[in-house]
Curated annotation (Swiss-Prot):
Disease: Oocyte/zygote/embryo maturation arrest 8: An autosomal recessive infertility disorder due to failure of the fertilized ovum to undergo zygotic cleavage.
Record text on subunit structure and interactions: Interacts with CNOT7. Interacts with EIF4E. Interacts with CNOT8.
Disulfide pairings: none
Annotated protein name in UniProt: Protein BTG4
GO biological process, one term: neuron differentiation
Tissue specificity comment: Expressed in oocytes after germinal vesicle breakdown. Expressed in testis and in olfactory epithelium.
Keyword Transmembrane helix: no
Organism in which the protein naturally occurs: Homo sapiens (Human)
Keywords for this protein: Disease variant
Reported function: Adapter protein that bridges CNOT7, a catalytic subunit of the CCR4-NOT complex, to EIF4E. Facilitates maternal mRNAs decay during the maturation of oocytes and in the fertilized egg, and is required for the maternal-zygotic transition (MZT), zygotic cleavage and initiation of embryonic development.
Length: 223
């Protein structure tokens, strides 16, 4: 649950940063509130033994019928951020499920995987997948094979990690990680160790990018 929620917050925040309407401090405040709210909301609806259970409940959704998702709107209110300044797609759905985070741009398009924790992924591949998902927000959502320069790089990135499993729902334990991970460096050459997506250091081998990964059918939250 910690990895999935941290990934979701990182993904949403990358979209917000791309819109470039909020200051660094505003983004940090919004990210802290969003992570706290997601933990509070999902902790009683998380079923690792049956990931599809509660899927519709764990659905963050924006469309023409509801242009403000309640969870995102609450995070904005509690962080004093204008929802319109997030710059999120007008039609976007994010499913936060055990072992997998999926997204769909447009109500009629197919969902795709943002990050999967089902198998062994190199952590740079997880970042790469999230970066590609972000790039799809401003590109043709029907295309699914190419990667832009940023999404295909293997540069280090860090997603916030809640290190204490006994206190993951306490607000004070969620604040600290956000001070550094939002400071995303631009292109860097990394030869040996890499900083992992969830804060670990490891040595990755050269592999071809996975990029687009279609997801299985998902249950929408009824608006």
């Amino acid at each position: 649950m910690r990895d999935e929620i941290a990934t979701t917050v990182f993904f949403v925040t990358r979209l917000v940063k791309k819109h470039d309407k909020l200051s660094k401090q505003q983004i940090e405040d919004f990210a802290e509130k969003l992570m706290t709210i997601l933990f509070e909301t999902y902790r009683s609806h998380w079923h690792s033994d049956c990931p599809s259970k509660g899927q519709a409940f764990r659905c963050i959704r924006i469309n023409n019928n509801q242009n403000k998702d309640p969870i995102l709107e609450r995070a904005c209110v509690e962080s004093n951020v204008d929802f319109s300044h997030l710059g999120l797609p007008k039609e976007m759905t994010i499913w936060v499920d055990p072992f997998e985070v999926c997204c769909r741009y447009g109500e009629k398009n197919h969902p795709f995987t943002v990050a999967s924790f089902k198998g062994r992924w190199e952590e740079w591949e997880l970042y790469q997948q999230i970066s590609y998902a972000v790039s799809r927000a401003s590109s043709d959502v029907s295309s699914g094979t190419s990667c832009d320069e940023e999404s295909c790089s293997k540069e280090p990135r860090v997603i916030p990690k809640v290190s204490n499993p006994k206190s993951i729902y306490q607000v004070e334990n969620l604040k600290q990680p956000f001070q550094s991970w939002l400071q995303i460096p631009r292109k860097k050459n990394v030869v040996d160790g890499r900083v992992g997506l969830l804060g670990n250091t490891y040595h990755g081998s050269q592999k071809h990018p996975k990029c687009y990964r279609p997801a299985m059918h998902r249950l929408d939250r009824i608006l």
